[in-house]
């Protein structure tokens, strides 16, 4: 998020040097207290500790990228296309996780419209190594992951309660690591109440006014991770009915951008009353086609093309 903020036309970063609130000197406390908003990219326990101190300092807006309060009914949950902008009076916004973002973008509109059954939802989430965190683990060593792929945290993934809470339905959820750095493809198997074309139409209707979500005609035309890595874009698609009666619904995102940093900035823009796309890579002008070169999308934070500097 720091790289995005540093190129934002309307936001100035304040970065006091302290590992805990107790280490802040008077200058650091004053600098934080003067901020319009503070983003916390910390583990949950540390985020709670810092948030408490920041509230005492009178910081008006706290954007938390941890999972500390993502299920708190008093906290705005920040997927703008699903839950809108934070209210001007809100003091706390919970930025969603990467797997929840992809899963909810693809399934929540279908459930809200009554197009799929609430039971028997099975989700396979595949992600690059960065999606498994920064902790030391054998599975993340290059010699173990390169040219390899395997499931992890089966039956105990911490994002399941978050997904079920905001989806309003139980799910079966399995995650699998890919031998890549970033990028996430989530495939959900659902039991439809209507034909797949109606599912696709439901997604298109919901996201018609949201340029950072693109619904594809076919899942095998443009769904590759190379189309989303380095971007804020989410790509969605619906497959045909299988012989089992289930339909696959797909979502691909960059787990480090839409699943974390760029979504945080999207929320912050809306919260501050700025243009939603300021500081973000521009949305796709059209749906991508075909298989992209591996990770051809380059990180770009030049937002002039989509904001036209509307606040100048």
Task: Map each language-model feature to its residues.
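N-terminal Rossmann-like NAD(P) cofactor-binding subdomain of oxidoreductases
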Residues: 1-145, 149-152, 239-242, 277, ...
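Anionic group-transfer/hydrolysis microenvironments
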Residues: 66, 189, 254
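Conserved active-site and cofactor/substrate-binding residues in soluble primary-metabolism enzymes
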Residues: 74, 98-105, 154-162, 198, ...
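C-terminal helical cap and adjacent loop that interface with cofactors, partners, or active-site loops
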Residues: 227-298, 311-312
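C-terminal substrate-binding/catalytic lobe of Rossmann-fold NAD(P)-dependent oxidoreductases
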Residues: 2-3, 7-30, 41, 118-125, ...
């Amino acid at each position: 998020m720091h790289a995005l903020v540093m190129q934002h036309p309307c936001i100035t970063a304040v970065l006091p040097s302290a590992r805990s609130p107790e280490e802040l000197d008077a200058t650091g406390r004053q600098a934080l207290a003067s901020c319009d908003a503070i983003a916390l990219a910390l583990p949950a326990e540390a985020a709670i500790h810092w948030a408490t101190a920041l509230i005492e300092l009178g910081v008006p807006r706290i954007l938390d990228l941890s999972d500390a309060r993502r299920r708190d009914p008093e906290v705005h949950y920040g997927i703008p296309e699903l839950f809108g902008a934070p209210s001007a009076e809100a003091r706390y916004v919970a930025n969603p996780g990467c797997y929840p973002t992809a899963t909810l973008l693809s399934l929540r509109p279908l459930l809200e419209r009554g197009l799929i059954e609430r039971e028997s939802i099975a989700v396979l989430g595949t992600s690059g190594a960065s999606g498994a965190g920064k902790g030391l683990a054998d599975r993340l060593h290059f010699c173990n992951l390169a040219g390899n792929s395997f499931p992890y945290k089966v039956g105990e993934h911490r994002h399941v309660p978050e997904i079920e809470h905001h989806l309003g339905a139980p799910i079966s959820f399995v995650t699998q690591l890919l031998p890549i750095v970033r990028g996430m493809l989530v495939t959900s198997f659902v039991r439809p109440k209507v034909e797949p074309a109606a599912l696709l139409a439901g997604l298109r209707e919901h996201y018609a006014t949201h340029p950072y979500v693109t619904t594809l005609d076919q899942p095998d035309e443009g769904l590759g991770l190379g189309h989303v890595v380095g971007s804020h874009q989410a790509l969605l698609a619906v497959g045909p009915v299988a012989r089992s009666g289930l339909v696959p619904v797909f979502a691909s995102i960059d787990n480090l951008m839409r699943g974390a940093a760029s979504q945080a900035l999207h929320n912050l823009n809306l919260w501050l009353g700025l243009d939603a796309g300021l500081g973000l890579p521009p949305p796709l002008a059209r749906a991508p086609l075909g298989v992209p070169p591996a990770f051809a999308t380059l990180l770009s934070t030049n937002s002039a093309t989509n904001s036209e500097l509307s606040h100048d």
